[in-house]
């Protein structure tokens, strides 16, 4: 057998062990997130806020993966040594601020309870004003950035959320060495990456959510970002230059 593990992270971590030869499911397990309401951190004062604690991802991923492997171990002939890879699936855009060691700020006691230091879940809509401003600025100065994404930038996406953080929680923005999508953070942890500059960024999140395209040199240029806020232009240098398709290992 060549056996991969697939892990899906949304309101819980769901792990599946599959036989590559025939697609047969050998074991499954689910582990919920302990924080917030069914895994989501809410704010009764703001119905648009939806965050998750980054520590929940790793705790639940560990538990669900072990559970799925334990279930697979009951299959005749299965061996953990036959596991050939781990694939992950997440919802996005779910960016999170990280320190210079690629550690989420929310894992630091200083930021543990700060809403802006959490993972900004895909369905967080607190950045509606920022999304509208990005759309209008792009229409006036760089319409090419909007062409691949339907002509409108969303409050659910990368730049609008980071810009909102800069406005409402500049201390968190200043403390972040970089920002990483959940889709990139989990594989980076599994691969032992400890520097945000070394995280392999997936082209799906980068392209659709962060307006990345090789045609214009990657992320939106500094001049465009500076029209939004000069500090976003500075952040660009701490993000990434290249994004990869899903068939590249982390």
Model-predicted segments: where are they?
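A short acidic, often aromatic-flanked loop/helix-cap motif at beta-alpha or helix-coil junctions
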Residues: 35-38, 128-129, 249-250
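Charge-dense, low-complexity intrinsically disordered segments
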Residues: 48-55, 121, 152, 173
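N-terminal glycine/serine-rich phosphate-binding loop of ATP-dependent small-molecule kinases
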Residues: 1-108, 233-242
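Gly/Ser/Thr-rich active-site cleft segment
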Residues: 10, 20, 98, 135-250
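Active-site phosphate-binding/coordination module
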Residues: 75-157
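A structural signal for well-ordered alpha-helical segments within the folded catalytic domains
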Residues: 59, 63, 125, 129, ...
């Amino acid at each position: 057998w060549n056996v991969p593990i697939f892990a899906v992270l949304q309101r819980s971590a769901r792990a599946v062990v599959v036989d590559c030869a025939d697609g047969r499911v050998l074991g499954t397990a689910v582990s919920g997130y302990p924080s917030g309401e069914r895994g989501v951190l809410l704010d009764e004062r703001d119905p648009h806020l939806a965050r998750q604690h980054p520590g929940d991802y790793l705790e639940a991923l560990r538990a669900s993966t072990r559970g799925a492997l334990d279930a697979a171990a009951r299959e005749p002939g299965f061996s953990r040594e036959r596991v050939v890879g781990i694939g992950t699936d997440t919802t996005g855009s779910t960016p999170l601020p990280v320190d210079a060691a690629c550690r989420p700020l929310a894992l630091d006691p200083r930021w543990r309870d700060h809403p802006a230091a959490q993972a900004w879940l895909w369905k967080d809509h607190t950045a509606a004003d920022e999304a509208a401003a990005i759309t209008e600025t792009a229409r006036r100065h760089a319409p090419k950035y909007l062409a691949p994404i339907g002509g409108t930038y969303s409050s659910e996406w990368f730049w609008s959320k980071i810009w909102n953080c800069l406005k409402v929680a500049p201390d968190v923005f200043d403390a972040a060495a970089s920002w990483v999508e959940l889709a990139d953070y989990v594989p980076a942890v599994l691969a032992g990456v400890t520097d945000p500059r070394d995280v392999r960024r997936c082209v799906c999140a980068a392209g659709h959510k962060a307006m990345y395209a090789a045609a214009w040199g990657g992320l939106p240029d500094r001049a465009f970002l500076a029209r939004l806020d000069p500090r976003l232009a500075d952040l660009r240098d701490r993000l990434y230059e290249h994004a990869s398709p899903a068939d590249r290992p982390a």
